[in-house]
């Protein structure tokens, strides 16, 4: 748990203490920025290189993952998720399990959906929406990454809607 610093943030859900699960669920930027400050840019850059995260380019800001120099494609996201799922990075298995638990969204029948949305905002407009994750069932694991970009109204929630509709049409999610 990381205690809230009593700064007023733009979303009520951010204005409290958070665990990994609650911070993932509410996309609490200050939670992850606090962890990043403890790690430092050198360690973060090293981790990004270790997992081959997109172009591995981070600036010195504390929001390098939001509309900055760090870029990744949907194909790279799927590759990263697959490696994360199989823990080919050789991270502590307990840490991998904790992250998997924190992105578990719903179990429906024999399917469990894991995922994370993200929204990039520039000048007050949602211009970049992501939904990445995977679906587990008794036969297979299906990985996905959806990225939408527009001058406005491109959000993670819209990317999630599109993804789930496609997965339902394909018979993977119902």
Language model: regions and residue ranges:
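Donor/substrate-binding cores of folate-linked one-carbon enzymes
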Residues: 27
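Active-site SXXK
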Residues: 1-2, 23, 144
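Generic preference for hydrophobic/aromatic residues in regular secondary structure cores
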Residues: 2, 56-60, 105, 109-113
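A generic structural signal for nonpolar/aromatic side chains embedded in well-ordered alpha-helices
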Residues: 23-24, 48, 99, 103
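Structured C-terminal helix/loop/strand segments within mature extracytoplasmic catalytic/sensor domains
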Residues: 37-40, 82-174
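Short, well-structured active-site flanking segments
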Residues: 1-10, 92-96
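Mid-domain, small-residue-enriched loop/turn segments at the edges of structured enzyme/sensor domains
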Residues: 6-20, 32-86
